[in-house]
Amino acid sequence: MAFKKPQITEVKTDIQSLSIYLRSVKKFGKTTLFRDLVLEKFGDPTKGLLVGCGAEMGYTILDNLNATQVEDWDDMEDLKDWLIEEKGKEHDIKMVAFDVVGELIPIAEEKIIRMSTKETGKVCKSFNSAFGGYGEPRKRLLKLLKEYFSALKKAGIMPFAISHTKVKSIKEKGDDTEGYNTLTSDLSNDCEGIFGDIFDCVLTGCIDREVKDGKVTTEVRKLYFRGNGYIDAGCRFANDAVPEYIVFDKPNMAKDFIKVLEDGLKKSRTNKITDEEFKEKQRKEVIELDKQVEQIRENKELSIETKTEIIDKVKANLSKIEIADLKAIMT
């Protein structure tokens, strides 16, 4: 990997440059929001892709949605290769949603089991015993997830992860109190940490209900962009660049959703610009995103060519080459 010279960073301007992790209670409207987001932003359903994961098929009664299904990790790898290799050829997908990422965990665990059998030469029958057990299976799992979504981001294809929520009891290390409750995702803490680290926006949807005499009198749907002690949420924006939450009360929330995030990007800039300048930067930014996938493809082709040259060199000198020299060539 070639050294990249340092350069001054600049805040992104377009929602296409954001990786988004959305958690909420079931039937909140997460999948519908992604569908509406694609249509509002691009006016074309083929610009987005909804990936149903494992047993989750939350898109079967939504129309105007570009969708596919993955059943195992090989499907995930094939999907990633297709997204990167065929962008600008078979497709022009800008955003990819994974619904729900909780279903990816058992899929990834099965992949780790197969990897263990292949790499160690010993039959592995359970995830916890993979690669000798202890903490190694979890390390491999987290690495697999992180590398997958990071690869998409590097290629300029921003992932949109969807998950369910769960109230968890949190107790900090060294804290003698009983801890506190927080509304976060239903993933294990280490997997949740991976998505929290990778994604730019960690959003949480919930429903506030007022109950009187054992009956719900009112309910308000809210989508949180910033946490409040109980709600776990946050974005990589400047302070107060986005509201704590928006009321999620319209049949189509896409326009409001896009405005909040793109306004947040604009407010996060240290040097203020006009709306016209902002739109021009958005236009250039989208072009640069498309160039990223081209660079990934070029790097991959160069890597393949280099390996081929090494193999040809070994074949040509196999009869006279020493083992020490062979190691030097391969490294």
Q: What are the roles of these predicted feature ranges?
A:
Residues E103-D190:
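P-loop NTPase motor core
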Residues C206-E280:
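Eukaryote-biased recognition of electropositive, low-complexity segments
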